[in-house]
């Protein structure tokens, strides 16, 4: 039976710009907003868009990500005709091959895609924060009779050189594409979200592999090839909230924006929920000493200090006289008595010892996964 569209989430990135936060886990598994992981947004968009089959392509440090996704039940992807599959590099008759780029990861999973037999494939990045109706994008793809549709976002001209930039005609047909140009001619930036007619993409990737032609990356190789070949390539304009959280500063900034109850992400919209795998935790405890202002405090937290404009993730602890300001405290982290934390991201399971002062005013301060700061070695 032919399925209309299969979603493939590229979730194998190492995320080196996030430093300590991704030393032990893949970037899409990094926590966000107190109760989510970054990949939850792409998975939830799929669920809300009525996409029943999702493949998650992993590579770097996949354990936490695999555990988080499980059988997909948190996103309703565990039914009879639905499913989520974890796709990792594997050994084939030609030998072991790591994914060499975004489109190479798709080529390496042709057998899986063929088993789903989709008419269209939706390619997504697993490390962006946004809400989007992919069904609306698919309808645009059909209306334009496109071979490829690229989701685009208007960005400030000064930031355009960080993205793949498209020039379009009056009908939004893409006539030129430049990957991270020094002098961009447009401000229409690729969001790394693509809809392809599967058979056309499949044929191109197979021919390129047999001919030893480099087609390993969508931005550098595939999109330019489509344009040169005269394929119908269209832009789908997106005007909602979208955040690339690939740096410490952008991740911190997105979390701070999320605190606002009227945030641009519209997090309280019940018609487009963001789902996640949430373990059952005890209720929060706020002592008589606790002072919490303009903050998000998730289940299982213990607060005996002061928290201002910050996020406390599941099971975080803030001991007596500790002060947290403009910071993200991830799950299970412990902030010791009298510690002072300002403009920082404290990783999962980290311990900040009594009296330690962290000030990220000049540059957001990061404490890594299970890292201990100020803890004597004999107590380590």
Swiss-Prot record:
This enzyme's EC code(s): 2.7.7.27
Highest taxon listed in the record's lineage: Bacteria
Pathway linked to the protein: Glycan biosynthesis; glycogen biosynthesis
GO molecular function annotation: ATP binding; glucose-1-phosphate adenylyltransferase activity
Listed GO biological process terms: glycogen biosynthetic process
Pfam family, one: Hexapep_GlmU
Catalytic activity: alpha-D-glucose 1-phosphate + ATP + H(+) = ADP-alpha-D-glucose + diphosphate
Binding sites annotated in the UniProt record for alpha-D-glucose 1-phosphate: 164, 179-180, 190
PROSITE patterns named in the record: ADP_GLC_PYROPHOSPH_1 (PS00808), ADP_GLC_PYROPHOSPH_2 (PS00809), ADP_GLC_PYROPHOSPH_3 (PS00810)
UniProt KW keywords: ATP-binding, Carbohydrate metabolism, Glycogen biosynthesis, Glycogen metabolism, Nucleotide-binding, Nucleotidyltransferase, Transferase
Annotated InterPro entries: ADP-Glc_PPase, ADP_Glu_pyroP_CS, GlgC_bac, GlmU/GlgC-like_hexapep, NTP_transferase_dom, Nucleotide-diphossugar_trans, Trimer_LpxA-like_sf
HAMAP family reported for this sequence: GlgC (MF_00624)
Entry's family note: Belongs to the bacterial/plant glucose-1-phosphate adenylyltransferase family.
Subunit (UniProt): Homotetramer.
Record function comment: Involved in the biosynthesis of ADP-glucose, a building block required for the elongation reactions to produce glycogen. Catalyzes the reaction between ATP and alpha-D-glucose 1-phosphate (G1P) to produce pyrophosphate and ADP-Glc.
Name this polypeptide is given: Glucose-1-phosphate adenylyltransferase
Organism per entry: Streptococcus gordonii (strain Challis / ATCC 35105 / BCRC 15272 / CH1 / DL1 / V288)
């Amino acid at each position: 039976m032919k399925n209309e569209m299969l979603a493939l989430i590229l979730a194998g990135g190492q995320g080196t710009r996030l430093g300590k936060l991704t030393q032990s886990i893949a970037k899409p598994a990094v926590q966000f907003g107190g109760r989510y992981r970054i990949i939850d947004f792409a998975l939830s968009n799929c669920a809300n868009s009525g996409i029943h089959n999702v493949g998650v392509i992993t590579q770097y440090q996949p354990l936490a990500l695999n555990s988080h996704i499980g059988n997909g039940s948190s996103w309703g992807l565990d039914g009879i005709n639905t499913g989520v599959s974890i796709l990792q590099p594997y050994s084939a008759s030609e030998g072991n091959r790591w994914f060499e780029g975004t489109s190479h990861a798709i080529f390496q999973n042709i057998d899986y895609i063929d088993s789903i037999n989709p008419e269209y494939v939706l390619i997504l990045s697993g490390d962006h924060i946004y809400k989007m109706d992919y069904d609306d994008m698919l309808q645009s793809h059909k209306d334009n009779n496109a071979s490829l549709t690229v989701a685009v976002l208007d960005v400030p001209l000064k930031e355009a050189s960080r993205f793949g930039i498209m020039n379009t005609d009056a009908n939004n047909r893409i006539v030129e594409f430049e990957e991270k140009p020094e002098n961009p001619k447009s401000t229409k930036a690729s969001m790394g979200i693509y809809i392809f007619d599967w058979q056309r993409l499949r044929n191109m990737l197979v021919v390129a592999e047999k001919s030893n032609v480099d087609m390993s990356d969508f931005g550098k190789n595939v999109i330019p090839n489509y344009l040169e070949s005269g394929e119908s390539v269209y832009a789908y304009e997106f005007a909602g909230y979208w955040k690339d959280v690939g740096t410490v500063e952008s991740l911190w900034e997105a979390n701070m924006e999320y605190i606002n109850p009227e945030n641009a992400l519209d997090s309280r919209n019940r018609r487009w929920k963001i789902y996640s795998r949430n373990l059952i935790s005890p209720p929060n405890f706020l002592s008589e000493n606790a002072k919490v202002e303009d903050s998000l405090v998730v289940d299982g937290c213990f607060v005996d200090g002061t928290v201002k404009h910050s996020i406390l993730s599941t099971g975080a602890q803030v001991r007596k006289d500790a002060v947290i300001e403009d910071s993200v405290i991830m799950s299970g982290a412990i902030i010791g008595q009298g510690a002072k934390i300002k403009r920082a991201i404290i990783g999962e399971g980290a311990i900040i010892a009594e009296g330690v002062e962290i000030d990220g005013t000049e540059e957001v301060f990061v404490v890594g996964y299970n890292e201990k700061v100020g803890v004597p070695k004999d107590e380590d």
